[in-house]
């Protein structure tokens, strides 16, 4: 609360190094709502583009870490090698491999040209081919299934009662995704097709995340091919009108919630952040009961 709105934008990006873009997007969308300002269509599409690239990065990173915790270090190394592809693409667009600083109040400060569009399409083709291999591994490899199938079970009813969100909830059959329930940024123009599973075990959580990668590849291609022309920013007052609002976006791991209160000055009176991992902690006990200690790293 001691920093200006613009200074806070860079602070919010550093709440999470893996999902810095969605944190800044949640913040700017909330501030823009208070100021009654809407970013131009091209800026909204770029916000969605970077968000989906960030989701790809997060899911591949998660796949590698989970594989490592289960003792599958070859899958860990292969997936993290492929993760470099999307990190290079994010660097091509923003200049940074982490903390992309794409958002500004009122729009974005990065754009994509024809060369970058070609690189994005080639990157999606490569990653899609690799992801097909990962899906085959997590659904057909007997050794892998021995560590994931019927492990860490959470039923639809339990997920509903515990408020599970993100891929964790969707792996138990919950139709919860902020991009679908309350579309923001470019999602009204480039909507998602939600991915769910019913089993509610570790295997289902792997499958949901990997299938979400295919959906992100589709969205990136669609945005690249149909991105609207126009400005990247619109004017926004330095002093944000008095009021309070909430801003919700779908981070890679679930709903990210921002509460923002303005007192009419160039500084916020209050900003409260609730991350998706905090919501999913409530489900850990349910998914862990009856399993071995060695299963806990993958369950977590």
Q: Which residues does each PLM region occupy?
A:
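Active-site bordering "gate/hinge" segments
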Residues: 1-300
């Amino acid at each position: 609360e001691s920093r200006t709105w613009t200074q806070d934008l860079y602070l919010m990006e550093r709440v999470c190094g893996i999902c810095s873009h969605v944190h800044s997007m949640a913040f700017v969308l909330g501030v823009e709502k208070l100021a009654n300002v809407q970013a131009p269509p091209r800026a909204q599409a770029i916000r969605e583009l970077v968000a989906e690239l960030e989701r790809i990065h997060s899911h591949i990173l998660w796949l590698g870490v989970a594989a490592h915790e289960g003792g599958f270090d070859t899958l860990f190394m292969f997936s993290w090698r492929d993760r470099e592809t999307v990190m290079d693409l994010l660097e091509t667009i923003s200049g940074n491999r982490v903390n992309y600083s794409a958002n500004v109040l009122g729009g974005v400060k990065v754009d994509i040209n024809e060369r970058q569009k070609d690189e994005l399409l080639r990157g999606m083709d490569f990653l899609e081919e690799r992801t097909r291999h990962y899906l085959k591994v997590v659904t057909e490899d007997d050794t892998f299934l021995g560590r994931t199938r019927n492990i860490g079970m959470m039923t639809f009813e339990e997920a509903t009662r515990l408020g599970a969100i993100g891929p964790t909830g969707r792996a138990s059959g919950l139709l919860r995704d902020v991009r679908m329930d309350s579309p923001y940024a470019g999602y009204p123009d480039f909507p998602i097709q939600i991915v769910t599973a019913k089993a509610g075990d570790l295997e289902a959580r792997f499958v949901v995340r990997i299938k979400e990668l295919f959906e992100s590849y589709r969205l990136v291609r669609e945005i690249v091919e149909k991105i609207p022309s126009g400005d990247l920013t619109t004017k926004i007052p330095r002093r944000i009108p008095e009021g309070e609002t909430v801003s919700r976006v779908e981070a890679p791991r679930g709903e990210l919630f921002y509460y923002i209160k303005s007192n009419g000055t160039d500084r916020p009176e209050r900003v409260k952040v609730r991350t998706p991992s905090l919501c999913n902690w409530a489900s850990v006990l349910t998914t862990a009961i009856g399993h071995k200690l060695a299963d806990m790293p993958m369950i977590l």
